[in-house]
Amino acid sequence: MSKHICATVALTLLACASWQAAIAAEQILEFKLVVKLIDPKTLEAPSVEGQVVLLSKAHGVAFFKDGRVASKDFIFSSDYNKGSGPFFGYSTYQFEDGSSITARFAGTQRAGQMTHGEYTVISGTGAYAGAKGTGSFDGVPHKLTGANLLNGKFTITTP
């Protein structure tokens, strides 16, 4: 009987440890982000009033709720008609410790409304090696000239 109890206790402890490890692997990262387009290229569609395609490199700085800072390098493309339409791009957030998160983002801009987009995390390095997950970002009203302010959030799972 005591061997059975010891085995049950050992299996219970192992299951609890595995469950705690799985929970510890999911992280929610909230941040504020300032971004600026670098050398944007715009093309107006001939014979389509208000149709503009934009392609640009961009850079930003993210300030995370936990006090960390990350540099954001990304590419961005949009296809707007009179200020509304789809956009997408690819971002890499580089943290001071060398870890990084790379994500694809996409959304639909509506003229006169704040930006909203969704992230799909596609990879990571360092503390985020093998990361997968999702996220979102929302424009914030501001008085910056030539830059944008956003609130963002990642929900990340690491192996």
For the regions a protein language model found, what residue spans apply to each?
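Bacterial N-terminal signal peptides that target proteins for export
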Residues: 1-9
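Bacterial N-terminal signal peptides
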Residues: 9-18
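Beta-strand-enriched cores of mature, soluble protein domains
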Residues: 23-159
